[in-house]
Amino acid sequence: MNLKTLWTHLRLYDRLTIGYLWFTAILVIFSPEAIHIRARLVLSHAAVTIYIFVIIYWTELHGQTQRHFLPPKWLRYLRDWHPLGWFSFLLFGEFTYLVRLLFPFAIEKHLIAFDLWLFGQPPHQFIQTHVPSWGVELMAFAYWSYYPLIFGVTWYYYSSRSAKTSRDLSSEISFVDFMNRLCLSFYSCYLLFILFPARSPRHALNLSAQLQLDGGPFYHLIATMQNYVSVVGAAFPSSHVAVTWVAVLTLWDRHRRVFWSLMPLVMALTLSIFVLQYHYFLDAIAGVITAFIFEWFWRRFYVSRAAAVTGGVKAAPADELTANSLT
């Protein structure tokens, strides 16, 4: 086994993950800014890269030399789901340190000005006056629903037998296809955070003392989570919105009833990031636009090209599940 053989077993989302890890690591290494987590960030990215190669070797290549080796199910889960762990517990939290590596918070004033023009007053004052406590709680529930929604759609594609075995591009998309799209949307948003840095209204306008919302258990849950995982930056576009729309848009072709049943929740989630003042209004709009651009790009350049080359059957080994991966 050599690195070239190992590289051919990487799926697109594995390569996107490794590419993003080392793009940001190189930015940090060569940045003139004083970044006190520089060494920790580079070492953690190197460790994640090694993990990806090791887990792929043990799940997909070790059996070629050890004929009777069958990777346990938990090991396959770690191999297939690893990007969601990095999004949740590592990468997003780095933006407090990454967001100003290239540019200042130049677009914030335009985002703030648009909100003032749209509402005729500071939005947090409008929200406090016009949104009742039950509305705040509804928005908090919608904001929280991002987590079970993303994991739920991902689990559907992972557990669906048709999604595992389908090879016809007009049929059910596979788990790997879905993860490729999800990771592409995550990493694209992360790059946009670096190219167009902006802080949330709570940070840019110092709303901690001014914004007094009255909600229920979901609002307090979200507020507690934000106290621990909130980052300074990563506002434009909203990845919360973009990734949700990307996930739900995959249901359009084959599961239209599910798509429409989720749409009220998705619309509420899109609005919630503004009502709770974790984002500007344009962040939400940009998140939706970004998701539709991703969907157009995927259909135009990935699916259509694969169909033209293979006559409707996918044949890219890096993006296909191996025989041992999901069975």
Task: Name the predicted role of every residue range.
Residues 191-254:
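Membrane-interfacial catalytic/cofactor-binding modules of polytopic membrane enzymes
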